[in-house]
Swiss-Prot record:
Any one GO CC term of the record: nucleus
Subunit structure: Component of the multiprotein chromatin-remodeling complexes SWI/SNF: SWI/SNF-A (BAF), SWI/SNF-B (PBAF) and related complexes. The canonical complex contains a catalytic subunit swsn-4, core subunits swsn-1 and swsn-5, and accessory subunits swsn-3, swsn-6, phf-10, dpff-1, swsn-9 and either ham-3/swsn-2.1 or swsn-2.2. May interact with blmp-1.
Top-rank taxon, per record: Eukaryota
Protein name: SWI/SNF chromatin-remodeling accessory subunit 1
InterPro entries: SWIB_domain, SWIB_MDM2_dom_sf, SWIB_MDM2_domain
Swiss-Prot/TrEMBL GO biological process terms: chromatin remodeling; determination of adult lifespan; negative regulation of transcription by RNA polymerase II; positive regulation of DNA-templated transcription; positive regulation of double-strand break repair; positive regulation of transcription by RNA polymerase II; regulation of G1/S transition of mitotic cell cycle; regulation of mitotic metaphase/anaphase transition
Reported tissue expression: Broadly expressed in all cell types.
Pfam families assigned to the protein according to its UniProt record, in alphabetical order: SWIB (PF02201)
Function (record text): Involved in transcriptional activation and repression of select genes by chromatin remodeling (alteration of DNA-nucleosome topology). Component of SWI/SNF chromatin remodeling complexes that carry out key enzymatic activities, changing chromatin structure by altering DNA-histone contacts within a nucleosome in an ATP-dependent manner. Required for the blmp-1-mediated transcriptional activation or repression of several hypodermal genes such as bed-3. Involved in regulating differentiation, migration and axon pathfinding of specific serotonergic neurons (HSNs).
Residue span(s) of domain SWIB/MDM2: 220-297
Keywords from the UniProt entry: Chromatin regulator, Nucleus, Transcription, Transcription regulation
Lineage: Eukaryota, Metazoa, Ecdysozoa, Nematoda, Chromadorea
GO molecular function: DNA-binding transcription factor binding; RNA polymerase II-specific DNA-binding transcription factor binding; transcription coactivator activity; transcription coregulator activity; transcription corepressor activity
Amino acid sequence: MQTQARPPVPQGPRFNHPATPQQVRRPINAPLPGQTAQIQGNRGPQPPKKKKRYADKLIQPKVRELVPESQAYMDLLAFEQKLDSTITRKKIDVQEALKRPQKIKKRLRIYISHTFIAGKEPEKEGDDASVPMWELRVEGRLLDDMQHPTVGANPRPAPKRKFSSFFKSLVIELDKDIYGPDNHLVEWHRTPQTNETDGFQVKRPGDRPVKCTILLLLDYQPMKFKLHPRLAKVLGIAAETRPRIIEALWQYIKTHKLQDPQDRDTINNDLFLEQCFGVSKMRFMEIPQRLHQLLQQPDPLVLNHIIQRPDDGQDKTSACYDIDVELEDPVKQQMANFVHNQTNANDIQLLDQKIFDLVDQINEMKLRRDFFLRFSNEPSGFIKKWVVSQNSDLKTLTESSGDGESDRYATTYSTTDTDEGVSRYMYQKIQQKRAELEQSLGIRNN
């Protein structure tokens, strides 16, 4: 046979089944070389690039049969999918945990000390005399900061909290008999413009022993409330945040089955709750309002101290007290960083795009291989099928699709499928209009 066949174009054909002529048909978007310029000139704007999916990373089973080593890639792909799902699930768990307040308890050591400054007599005329004075200092720090000092191995240590940041207010009450009713109180209250400090200092003239009372009100975040003694005894908590108090009350109601069996929104108070709220029944929505009357500001810390000279019978001039304070869990910041970490997102996208491109190249190579394999097995028959396919594609590219003359007549569309589709459509419309009419007339169809 002397017929010379033109070799296939580099792109190679796209096909579906090995036994049909369509398997060697050139795709519509790959015209003959002579027609490329004409087709591209008639194209409109390019559609947006299709987003790749996980399925686009998969290698076809026929490729895996030809290359058994590709199974290792599929195993890595399955492991990556499992790892991604695990990370996503953990991020969701972390996000839920971040919504809840996370506090840790630490011990704050408060130091109270005083010193005396002796007065000076004028050495000669014209010199100013100074009266004796005392200075009271209230300081403090966390015990963890003292036991675990910052070492050089940590380049960015966590910032230490100032002593004043733990309190909402501080009041020092001095002896009223000595300093009078107008000068015996020293107060500090937190404001939005407050600058935090590591301690407080108070200076006053005098060298006599002075009794002072230090009142410290802790700054709870979120705010805590002190419960009425009766309610505190019932719930077993003395001071807590409002949501925790409501939760504890609800648990008490559920445990003692105080919900009305007929009206679940009604609470039948037992003897103890009736003594607290003053009613035998109450609506569930009334609980926050009634509970507000039983909540008070927490009591301040009261520290008593005597300012006097050591030689007046006192061996020490300082005292320390340990109290428990609540701090934000440092792990919470690490959890937030984990959720919002996008450091490697761009690198992962670039690597995914490389994988997509490589898989596309592998699939394209598989098409070319099948093309040339069929050509080598049966050259003459393959060329005939390929020419027929190219001829069909050429007609599709150069002629308008469809038969315009036959499309003008109704007999073209008169088929059993068309009749059934029209009947179903009309029946559906009739039922829809009937339902609208019955609804407007108030007729209920049983």
